[in-house]
Amino acid sequence: PNHSSNLHEWFKEALASEKGSAARNRYIFRDGKGANGELPPSDWVSHFAPSSWTHESTFGGKNNQWFLHWFAPEQPDFNWENPEVHEDFLKTLKFWSDRGVDGFRIDVAHGLAKDLSEPFRSMPVHEGLEQRGNKGKGIWGDRNEVFAIYKEWRKLFNQYDPPRVAVAEAFVHPERLPLYASTKTLGQCFDFRFIETPFEAHAYKVATKEAIELAQKNKSSCTWTLSNHDQIRHATKMGLNPAVNRRAWMLSDGTSHPLDKESGTANALA
């Protein structure tokens, strides 16, 4: 819900529309800096590009504006300050819920709300994990305003029997996880501690204990996550290299094969 494709009909309509139009207001377009608007509106950087802003002429736009994307230029961000965006997502969620889906995985759940007040705050280094300490007041990640969106969704989900499930993908400070896993918002949130925790028994024990205590304190839940499509799969990290003769490996004490000095030698993503 943070962004669409640049090939989405909405974005193509936005590029073909005039400045200030309703079609462009579904996304985040701004005039550039410089004498002729040739510079990005701010110094914000993205996950996948040097700048979070791309000039619309890249995709055929003719209004000399820039659009915001926290990820790739081909993934323009929606403007969640626009009620039409809210309404369209509720329509989409209802469409699939009416057809019997059990639930939804919410990608980049922490990223929808943004501080678009001008002049823009400076962010020459991607906020990324640094937003974990912003207590809901960063530029992009984990802003408090995002929970109003999910409360809208929860009201819709609870109209069904059983209620529709939702799980957030949100890289946030552990103390903020219950806000996404609350029964008033999405209900579940992936806990990425096991991805970030060293593969060591005591570290896993501490991470597990902290997560359970936090969930109990806030009457939320734990949704353990060992890997996902953005990370090395745990089958790769922990599994035996396919080239290894398993019987010989076991008889040699399980450590001596040169191709298996450590687990995860394939180092494969999804």
Show where each model-derived region lies.
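Acidic/aromatic-lined carbohydrate-recognition and catalytic surfaces
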Residues: 1-94, 98, 111-174
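Short, solvent-exposed beta-strand-terminating loops
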Residues: 109-120, 232-242
